């Protein structure tokens, strides 16, 4: 039997790490109920907040009666960067990885994308530009969980996967409280 335990964990709340993100001028200084304003494109300053987190999953090959979800496609890409924290304005590597994942999954209709947007102006814009380029007028609902716990670095992917599984199991879209959701929520979340 092929089983793999996968996950991510990180606790970057050290004075050194916080000093680094403050030096980069990406750490939030907003005195708001939600200081991390991920995906809020009206923000005038960077609003990244760091958080601690961990998530772990068992991946098994094939179909199982007790499966929480199925991975039906994967995608990945890289791009030449000009700086260690840079990203192209159109999120080229994000576009390539999403297109690759959609193609490997047979191009299904996507109900929701859980973004990685961290609350930085340039990073959030690049990711949203990439989503617009890939999906165009068929853009799915977008959400994020960093407003709840901040950017957990190495744990972010696992926490996003946990959020996706929870939405699929409850058939409930989890919106971001400070954003108006313009799209209609489908009756049933499937992908």
Q: What is the meaning of each model-derived region?
A:
Residues 127-131:
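Charged helix-capping and loop-helix junction motifs
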Residues 98, 102-106, 114-117, 121, ...:
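Alpha-helix capping/termination and helix-coil
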Residues 1, 54-62, 161-165:
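Alpha-helical metal-binding/catalytic segments enriched in His/Glu/Asp
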């Amino acid at each position: 039997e092929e089983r793999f335990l996968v996950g991510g964990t990180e606790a970057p709340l050290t004075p050194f790490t916080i000093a680094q993100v403050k030096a980069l001028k990406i750490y939030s200084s907003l005195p708001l109920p939600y200081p991390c304003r991920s995906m809020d494109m009206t923000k005038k300053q960077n609003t990244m907040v760091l958080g601690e987190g961990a998530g772990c999953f068992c991946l098994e090959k094939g179909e199982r009666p007790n499966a929480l979800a199925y991975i039906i496609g994967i995608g990945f890409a890289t791009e030449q960067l000009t700086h260690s924290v840079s990203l192209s304005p159109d999120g080229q590597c994000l576009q390539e990885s999403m297109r690759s994942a959609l193609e490997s999954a047979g191009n299904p209709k996507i109900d929701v994308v859980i973004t990685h947007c961290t609350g930085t102006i340039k990073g959030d814009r690049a990711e949203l530009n990439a989503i617009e380029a890939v999906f165009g007028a068929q853009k799915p609902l977008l959400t994020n969980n960093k407003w709840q716990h901040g950017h957990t670095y190495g744990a972010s992917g696992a926490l996003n996967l946990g959020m996706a599984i929870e939405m699929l199991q409850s058939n409930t879209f989890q919106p971001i409280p400070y954003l108006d959701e313009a799209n209609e929520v489908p009756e049933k979340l499937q992908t």
